[in-house]
Amino acid sequence: MHKFKLSSHLLDLFSQYKFFSPIHGVQQLSSALVFESRLGRKIIYIPHSDYFSTFRKICDSLYDDYLSQIPINMSAIAYVEGKSYFNFIEPHRNNFFFIRIDIRHFFPSITDELIRNSFRDYFSESAISDIVKQSHLDAIVNFLTLNILDSSINSDFKESSILPMGFPLSPVVSNIIFRRIDIIIERLCAQLDITYTRYADDLLFSSRGKIGGSQTPFSKDSSSYSSFIHTDRFCESIKKILAIDGFKINKNKIIKSKHTLSLNGYTIIGSNNSDIRGEIRVSNKKTKIIEKLLHELNNKKSDKAIFFKCFISELPIPKYPSKKEKFFNDFFKSQIDNKLSGYRSYLISMIKFDEKYDCFDSFAIQKYQKLIFKIDLALSKR
Protein backbone atom coordinates (compact mmCIF):
# COMPACT_ATOMS: atom_id res chain seq x y z
CA MET A 1 0.00 0.00 0.00
CA HIS A 2 1.28 3.45 -0.97
CA LYS A 3 1.88 5.62 2.09
CA PHE A 4 1.77 9.41 2.22
CA LYS A 5 4.93 11.49 2.44
CA LEU A 6 4.85 15.19 3.20
CA SER A 7 4.88 17.23 0.00
CA SER A 8 7.36 20.03 -0.71
CA HIS A 9 4.45 22.49 -0.38
CA LEU A 10 3.59 21.22 3.10
CA LEU A 11 7.25 21.16 4.17
CA ASP A 12 7.53 24.76 3.02
CA LEU A 13 4.57 25.66 5.24
CA PHE A 14 6.13 23.77 8.15
CA SER A 15 9.36 25.75 7.66
CA GLN A 16 7.34 28.90 8.43
CA TYR A 17 5.80 27.32 11.52
CA LYS A 18 7.08 28.55 14.86
CA PHE A 19 7.40 25.03 16.27
CA PHE A 20 9.31 23.42 13.42
CA SER A 21 13.02 22.70 13.73
CA PRO A 22 15.18 22.24 10.59
CA ILE A 23 16.88 19.38 12.42
CA HIS A 24 14.27 17.83 14.74
CA GLY A 25 11.14 18.47 12.67
CA VAL A 26 7.69 19.26 14.07
CA GLN A 27 7.57 19.87 17.81
CA GLN A 28 4.44 18.90 19.71
CA LEU A 29 2.55 21.81 21.28
CA SER A 30 1.99 21.81 25.03
CA SER A 31 -0.99 23.11 26.98
CA ALA A 32 1.16 26.09 28.05
CA LEU A 33 1.37 27.24 24.42
CA VAL A 34 -2.38 27.34 23.71
CA PHE A 35 -5.42 29.04 25.18
CA GLU A 36 -7.39 26.72 27.49
CA SER A 37 -11.04 27.33 28.35
CA ARG A 38 -13.97 25.37 29.73
CA LEU A 39 -17.14 24.68 27.76
CA GLY A 40 -19.38 23.08 30.34
CA ARG A 41 -17.42 20.05 31.52
CA LYS A 42 -15.30 19.95 28.39
CA ILE A 43 -12.01 21.76 27.87
CA ILE A 44 -11.31 23.59 24.62
CA TYR A 45 -7.84 24.38 23.29
CA ILE A 46 -7.21 27.22 20.84
CA PRO A 47 -3.77 27.93 19.28
CA HIS A 48 -2.42 31.40 20.08
CA SER A 49 -2.82 34.15 17.50
CA ASP A 50 0.94 34.67 17.01
CA TYR A 51 1.22 31.37 15.11
CA PHE A 52 -2.40 30.57 14.25
CA SER A 53 -2.27 31.84 10.66
CA THR A 54 0.49 29.40 9.68
CA PHE A 55 -1.07 26.68 11.84
CA ARG A 56 -4.34 27.07 9.94
CA LYS A 57 -2.63 26.92 6.53
CA ILE A 58 -0.92 23.67 7.53
CA CYS A 59 -4.27 22.27 8.69
CA ASP A 60 -5.91 23.13 5.38
CA SER A 61 -3.09 21.52 3.40
CA LEU A 62 -3.10 18.40 5.58
CA TYR A 63 -6.83 17.98 5.09
CA ASP A 64 -6.92 18.66 1.35
CA ASP A 65 -3.90 16.55 0.44
CA TYR A 66 -4.07 13.69 2.95
CA LEU A 67 -6.79 13.39 5.59
CA SER A 68 -9.68 13.86 3.15
CA GLN A 69 -8.45 10.76 1.30
CA ILE A 70 -8.46 8.49 4.36
CA PRO A 71 -11.71 6.48 4.66
CA ILE A 72 -14.18 6.79 7.52
CA ASN A 73 -17.14 4.56 8.33
CA MET A 74 -20.59 5.32 6.90
CA SER A 75 -22.09 5.40 10.39
CA ALA A 76 -20.02 8.51 11.25
CA ILE A 77 -22.14 11.62 10.68
CA ALA A 78 -20.57 14.55 12.55
CA TYR A 79 -17.99 16.68 10.71
CA VAL A 80 -18.76 14.92 7.41
CA GLU A 81 -19.34 17.16 4.41
CA GLY A 82 -22.92 16.98 3.14
CA LYS A 83 -24.27 15.41 6.34
CA SER A 84 -26.16 16.98 9.23
CA TYR A 85 -27.76 16.02 12.53
CA PHE A 86 -30.79 14.88 10.52
CA ASN A 87 -28.65 12.14 8.95
CA PHE A 88 -27.81 11.02 12.48
CA ILE A 89 -31.43 10.52 13.58
CA GLU A 90 -33.36 9.79 10.35
CA PRO A 91 -32.21 6.15 9.90
CA HIS A 92 -33.85 5.32 13.25
CA ARG A 93 -37.35 6.71 12.69
CA ASN A 94 -38.85 3.42 11.47
CA ASN A 95 -37.76 1.59 14.62
CA PHE A 96 -39.40 1.49 18.04
CA PHE A 97 -36.68 0.98 20.67
CA PHE A 98 -33.89 3.50 21.13
CA ILE A 99 -30.75 3.82 23.20
CA ARG A 100 -28.27 6.68 23.15
CA ILE A 101 -24.81 5.93 24.56
CA ASP A 102 -22.35 8.74 25.27
CA ILE A 103 -18.57 8.29 25.22
CA ARG A 104 -16.79 9.78 28.22
CA HIS A 105 -13.95 12.23 27.42
CA PHE A 106 -14.17 11.48 23.70
CA PHE A 107 -11.43 13.72 22.25
CA PRO A 108 -8.84 13.44 25.05
CA SER A 109 -9.28 9.66 25.05
CA ILE A 110 -7.69 9.69 21.59
CA THR A 111 -4.00 9.61 22.52
CA ASP A 112 -0.95 10.25 20.37
CA GLU A 113 -0.19 6.53 20.48
CA LEU A 114 -3.67 5.64 19.24
CA ILE A 115 -3.28 8.11 16.36
CA ARG A 116 0.19 6.80 15.55
CA ASN A 117 -1.02 3.20 15.43
CA SER A 118 -3.92 4.13 13.17
CA PHE A 119 -2.01 6.50 10.89
CA ARG A 120 0.82 3.98 10.46
CA ASP A 121 -1.31 2.47 7.69
CA TYR A 122 -1.39 5.77 5.81
CA PHE A 123 1.81 7.77 6.50
CA SER A 124 5.40 6.77 5.81
CA GLU A 125 7.72 6.00 8.72
CA SER A 126 10.78 6.96 6.71
CA ALA A 127 12.76 10.10 7.58
CA ILE A 128 11.56 13.37 6.08
CA SER A 129 15.03 14.06 4.66
CA ASP A 130 18.72 13.39 5.23
CA ILE A 131 18.76 16.38 7.57
CA VAL A 132 15.35 16.04 9.25
CA LYS A 133 15.44 12.56 10.78
CA GLN A 134 11.86 12.77 12.07
CA SER A 135 9.51 10.46 10.17
CA HIS A 136 6.58 11.73 8.13
CA LEU A 137 4.28 9.85 10.52
CA ASP A 138 5.76 11.38 13.67
CA ALA A 139 5.60 14.87 12.16
CA ILE A 140 1.87 14.47 11.55
CA VAL A 141 1.18 12.98 14.99
CA ASN A 142 3.14 15.75 16.75
CA PHE A 143 1.26 18.43 14.84
CA LEU A 144 -2.17 16.97 15.58
CA THR A 145 -1.73 16.30 19.30
CA LEU A 146 -1.21 18.32 22.47
CA ASN A 147 0.92 17.54 25.51
CA ILE A 148 -1.08 18.26 28.68
CA LEU A 149 1.28 19.66 31.31
CA ASP A 150 0.88 19.44 35.05
CA SER A 151 -0.07 23.15 35.06
CA SER A 152 -3.09 22.52 32.81
CA ILE A 153 -6.68 22.97 33.99
CA ASN A 154 -7.33 19.49 32.54
CA SER A 155 -6.85 17.47 35.73
CA ASP A 156 -8.00 14.19 34.14
CA PHE A 157 -5.31 14.05 31.45
CA LYS A 158 -2.23 15.70 32.93
CA GLU A 159 1.07 14.43 31.52
CA SER A 160 -0.76 12.88 28.56
CA SER A 161 -0.60 13.59 24.84
CA ILE A 162 -4.11 13.89 23.44
CA LEU A 163 -6.19 14.93 20.45
CA PRO A 164 -7.29 18.40 21.60
CA MET A 165 -10.89 19.51 21.28
CA GLY A 166 -10.82 22.89 19.52
CA PHE A 167 -7.99 22.21 17.06
CA PRO A 168 -9.28 22.48 13.46
CA LEU A 169 -8.42 18.93 12.41
CA SER A 170 -9.44 17.10 15.59
CA PRO A 171 -13.01 16.32 14.40
CA VAL A 172 -11.75 14.83 11.12
CA VAL A 173 -9.04 12.84 12.90
CA SER A 174 -11.54 11.49 15.44
CA ASN A 175 -13.66 9.96 12.66
CA ILE A 176 -10.59 8.34 11.10
CA ILE A 177 -9.42 6.91 14.43
CA PHE A 178 -12.89 5.68 15.39
CA ARG A 179 -13.39 3.85 12.08
CA ARG A 180 -12.16 0.55 13.52
CA ILE A 181 -14.64 0.74 16.41
CA ASP A 182 -17.44 1.84 14.06
CA ILE A 183 -16.84 -1.21 11.87
CA ILE A 184 -16.89 -3.64 14.81
CA ILE A 185 -20.09 -2.09 16.20
CA GLU A 186 -21.66 -2.06 12.75
CA ARG A 187 -20.96 -5.78 12.29
CA LEU A 188 -22.50 -6.59 15.67
CA CYS A 189 -25.58 -4.53 14.82
CA ALA A 190 -25.94 -6.15 11.38
CA GLN A 191 -26.12 -9.58 13.04
CA LEU A 192 -28.82 -8.39 15.46
CA ASP A 193 -30.88 -6.24 13.04
CA ILE A 194 -29.98 -3.06 14.93
CA THR A 195 -29.59 0.37 13.30
CA TYR A 196 -26.46 2.30 14.33
CA THR A 197 -25.24 5.85 13.70
CA ARG A 198 -22.67 8.00 15.49
CA TYR A 199 -22.43 11.76 15.92
CA ALA A 200 -18.99 12.40 17.47
CA ASP A 201 -19.29 10.99 21.01
CA ASP A 202 -23.00 10.11 20.70
CA LEU A 203 -23.78 6.53 19.69
CA LEU A 204 -27.40 5.94 18.68
CA PHE A 205 -28.96 2.49 18.34
CA SER A 206 -32.49 1.45 17.47
CA SER A 207 -34.46 -1.67 16.62
CA ARG A 208 -37.91 -3.07 16.30
CA GLY A 209 -39.00 -5.41 19.06
CA LYS A 210 -41.20 -8.37 19.75
CA ILE A 211 -44.80 -7.76 20.77
CA GLY A 212 -46.34 -10.14 23.25
CA GLY A 213 -49.78 -10.73 24.71
CA SER A 214 -52.75 -8.78 23.36
CA GLN A 215 -50.79 -5.63 22.55
CA THR A 216 -51.01 -4.09 19.09
CA PRO A 217 -48.28 -2.48 17.00
CA PHE A 218 -49.95 0.88 17.66
CA SER A 219 -49.31 0.79 21.42
CA LYS A 220 -46.79 3.34 22.64
CA ASP A 221 -45.94 1.87 26.01
CA SER A 222 -46.13 -1.71 27.13
CA SER A 223 -44.00 -3.94 29.30
CA SER A 224 -44.66 -6.77 26.85
CA TYR A 225 -42.47 -5.05 24.26
CA SER A 226 -38.88 -6.23 24.37
CA SER A 227 -35.63 -5.45 22.62
CA PHE A 228 -32.07 -6.63 23.07
CA ILE A 229 -30.68 -3.07 22.94
CA HIS A 230 -32.37 -2.29 26.27
CA THR A 231 -30.59 -5.12 28.07
CA ASP A 232 -27.47 -4.87 30.22
CA ARG A 233 -25.90 -7.45 27.93
CA PHE A 234 -26.07 -5.08 24.95
CA CYS A 235 -24.49 -2.20 26.89
CA GLU A 236 -21.78 -4.53 28.11
CA SER A 237 -21.06 -5.60 24.52
CA ILE A 238 -20.65 -1.97 23.42
CA LYS A 239 -18.53 -1.25 26.49
CA LYS A 240 -16.11 -4.07 25.58
CA ILE A 241 -15.85 -2.90 21.97
CA LEU A 242 -15.11 0.70 23.02
CA ALA A 243 -12.46 -0.53 25.46
CA ILE A 244 -10.43 -1.94 22.55
CA ASP A 245 -9.13 1.58 21.89
CA GLY A 246 -9.44 2.90 25.42
CA PHE A 247 -12.88 4.56 25.22
CA LYS A 248 -15.35 4.47 28.11
CA ILE A 249 -19.12 4.84 28.37
CA ASN A 250 -20.58 7.73 30.34
CA LYS A 251 -23.16 5.72 32.30
CA ASN A 252 -24.96 8.84 33.54
CA LYS A 253 -25.83 9.88 29.99
CA ILE A 254 -27.34 6.65 28.70
CA ILE A 255 -30.88 7.25 27.41
CA LYS A 256 -33.30 4.39 26.75
CA SER A 257 -36.76 4.94 25.30
CA LYS A 258 -39.64 3.36 23.40
CA HIS A 259 -41.53 4.93 20.49
CA THR A 260 -40.25 8.47 21.10
CA LEU A 261 -36.72 9.78 21.61
CA SER A 262 -35.78 13.44 22.10
CA LEU A 263 -32.18 14.58 21.55
CA ASN A 264 -30.89 18.16 21.44
CA GLY A 265 -34.17 19.70 20.33
CA TYR A 266 -35.03 16.97 17.82
CA THR A 267 -37.53 14.16 18.31
CA ILE A 268 -37.79 10.76 16.65
CA ILE A 269 -41.33 9.39 16.52
CA GLY A 270 -40.70 5.72 15.93
CA SER A 271 -42.74 2.84 14.56
CA ASN A 272 -42.90 -0.88 15.22
CA ASN A 273 -44.96 -1.61 12.13
CA SER A 274 -43.95 -1.55 8.48
CA ASP A 275 -47.28 0.13 7.59
CA ILE A 276 -46.67 3.08 9.92
CA ARG A 277 -44.14 5.71 8.89
CA GLY A 278 -41.84 7.08 11.58
CA GLU A 279 -41.17 10.82 11.68
CA ILE A 280 -38.63 13.43 12.73
CA ARG A 281 -39.79 16.55 14.55
CA VAL A 282 -38.04 19.75 15.53
CA SER A 283 -38.86 21.21 18.94
CA ASN A 284 -40.97 24.37 19.06
CA LYS A 285 -38.13 26.01 20.97
CA LYS A 286 -36.01 26.03 17.80
CA THR A 287 -38.68 27.78 15.73
CA LYS A 288 -39.96 30.10 18.47
CA ILE A 289 -36.80 32.22 18.37
CA ILE A 290 -37.37 32.71 14.62
CA GLU A 291 -40.98 33.71 15.24
CA LYS A 292 -39.88 36.05 18.03
CA LEU A 293 -37.35 37.81 15.80
CA LEU A 294 -39.93 38.24 13.02
CA HIS A 295 -42.46 39.58 15.53
CA GLU A 296 -40.02 42.21 16.81
CA LEU A 297 -39.14 43.25 13.24
CA ASN A 298 -42.83 43.63 12.40
CA ASN A 299 -43.19 45.96 15.39
CA LYS A 300 -40.57 48.18 13.72
CA LYS A 301 -38.26 48.29 16.72
CA SER A 302 -34.64 49.38 16.35
CA ASP A 303 -32.00 46.79 15.53
CA LYS A 304 -30.39 47.49 18.89
CA ALA A 305 -33.63 46.83 20.80
CA ILE A 306 -34.30 43.67 18.80
CA PHE A 307 -30.76 42.39 19.33
CA PHE A 308 -30.93 42.71 23.12
CA LYS A 309 -34.44 41.26 23.29
CA CYS A 310 -33.80 38.22 21.09
CA PHE A 311 -30.14 37.38 21.60
CA ILE A 312 -27.65 37.22 24.44
CA SER A 313 -24.16 38.08 23.27
CA GLU A 314 -21.11 40.06 24.32
CA LEU A 315 -20.60 43.29 22.41
CA PRO A 316 -17.34 43.86 20.54
CA ILE A 317 -15.07 46.79 21.38
CA PRO A 318 -15.01 49.52 18.70
CA LYS A 319 -11.60 50.05 17.14
CA TYR A 320 -12.20 53.81 16.87
CA PRO A 321 -14.10 55.30 19.87
CA SER A 322 -14.99 58.40 17.84
CA LYS A 323 -17.00 56.22 15.44
CA LYS A 324 -18.65 54.20 18.19
CA GLU A 325 -22.26 54.98 17.21
CA LYS A 326 -21.83 53.98 13.56
CA PHE A 327 -19.87 50.89 14.59
CA PHE A 328 -22.69 49.59 16.79
CA ASN A 329 -25.44 50.51 14.31
CA ASP A 330 -23.63 48.48 11.65
CA PHE A 331 -22.98 45.68 14.14
CA PHE A 332 -26.62 45.32 15.23
CA LYS A 333 -27.86 45.41 11.62
CA SER A 334 -25.36 42.83 10.41
CA GLN A 335 -26.12 40.53 13.33
CA ILE A 336 -29.85 40.55 12.63
CA ASP A 337 -29.32 40.16 8.87
CA ASN A 338 -26.99 37.21 9.51
CA LYS A 339 -29.49 35.61 11.89
CA LEU A 340 -32.30 35.94 9.35
CA SER A 341 -30.15 34.45 6.59
CA GLY A 342 -28.99 31.64 8.88
CA TYR A 343 -32.53 30.76 9.95
CA ARG A 344 -33.63 30.81 6.31
CA SER A 345 -30.86 28.36 5.34
CA TYR A 346 -31.74 26.12 8.30
CA LEU A 347 -35.42 25.95 7.33
CA ILE A 348 -34.60 25.31 3.68
CA SER A 349 -32.24 22.49 4.70
CA MET A 350 -35.12 20.76 6.53
CA ILE A 351 -37.43 21.08 3.53
CA LYS A 352 -34.77 19.68 1.20
CA PHE A 353 -34.02 16.85 3.61
CA ASP A 354 -37.73 16.00 3.72
CA GLU A 355 -37.91 16.01 -0.09
CA LYS A 356 -35.24 13.30 -0.09
CA TYR A 357 -36.35 11.20 2.90
CA ASP A 358 -40.06 12.07 3.43
CA CYS A 359 -39.53 12.12 7.19
CA PHE A 360 -41.20 15.33 8.47
CA ASP A 361 -44.84 15.89 9.30
CA SER A 362 -46.61 17.71 6.42
CA PHE A 363 -47.94 20.40 8.77
CA ALA A 364 -44.41 21.10 9.98
CA ILE A 365 -43.18 21.52 6.40
CA GLN A 366 -45.99 24.00 5.73
CA LYS A 367 -44.96 25.90 8.86
CA TYR A 368 -41.33 26.08 7.71
CA GLN A 369 -42.40 27.29 4.26
CA LYS A 370 -44.45 30.10 5.81
CA LEU A 371 -41.52 31.12 8.00
CA ILE A 372 -39.23 31.26 4.96
CA PHE A 373 -41.75 33.53 3.20
CA LYS A 374 -41.83 35.84 6.24
CA ILE A 375 -38.03 35.90 6.46
CA ASP A 376 -37.76 36.78 2.76
CA LEU A 377 -40.23 39.60 3.30
CA ALA A 378 -38.30 40.88 6.33
CA LEU A 379 -34.99 40.78 4.45
CA SER A 380 -36.48 42.67 1.49
CA LYS A 381 -37.43 45.53 3.81
CA ARG A 382 -33.98 45.91 5.35
Short names for language-model regions:
Residues 1-101, 106-117, 121-131, 141-167, ...:
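Right-hand nucleic-acid polymerase module
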Residues 170:
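Active-site-proximal polar cores
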Residues 173:
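Conserved binding-pocket/active-site segment within a compact domain
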Residues 181, 186-194, 208:
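Long, contiguous secondary-structure blocks with strong helical propensity
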Residues 195-199, 253:
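Short beta-strand
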Residues 205-211:
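Short beta-strand-to-loop capping motifs
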